[in-house]
């Protein structure tokens, strides 16, 4: 894909379903390239990655999901925003779009989800970059 083919065009909004939730993601095209997931942090949305996706889309098939309860994704009616639920949602996107093994760049909450996803599904992740994705220490969590 040449820079001319992609200049000035934005991503396509798409949806997938996980645990009966309608979840949103954007697809930056270039489906024959290696897959790259960009996972945002808490209180954020998928379009926060536009600057990076624009720069990398010539070499990657980039998808950026809105986590449940974020952006254009549905809120959980039962209030389930557990890490396990987020990990499952990410696994569903990777499975339904046949992205594995996938490279993931993730920030904050997204980094925490991606690290846990890689631990549960190591064969589904080619490479992982987690930016500030560790979260609170076990000692701090125990004090809560």
Task: Tell where the protein language model's regions lie, with residue ranges.
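Active-site loop/oxyanion-hole signature of alpha/beta-hydrolase fold enzymes
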Residues: 16-20, 26-28, 64-105, 109
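Alpha/beta-hydrolase fold catalytic core
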Residues: 1-36, 57-60, 98-100, 135
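Conserved HGGG/HGGXW glycine-rich cap/lid loop of the alpha/beta-hydrolase fold
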Residues: 21-75
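Short aromatic-enriched loop/helix-cap "lid" or pocket-rim segments at secondary-structure transitions
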Residues: 74-77, 139-143
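A conserved amphipathic alpha-helix that caps or lines the catalytic cleft of carbohydrate-
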Residues: 53, 94, 117-118
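Conserved hydrolase catalytic core segment
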Residues: 100-141
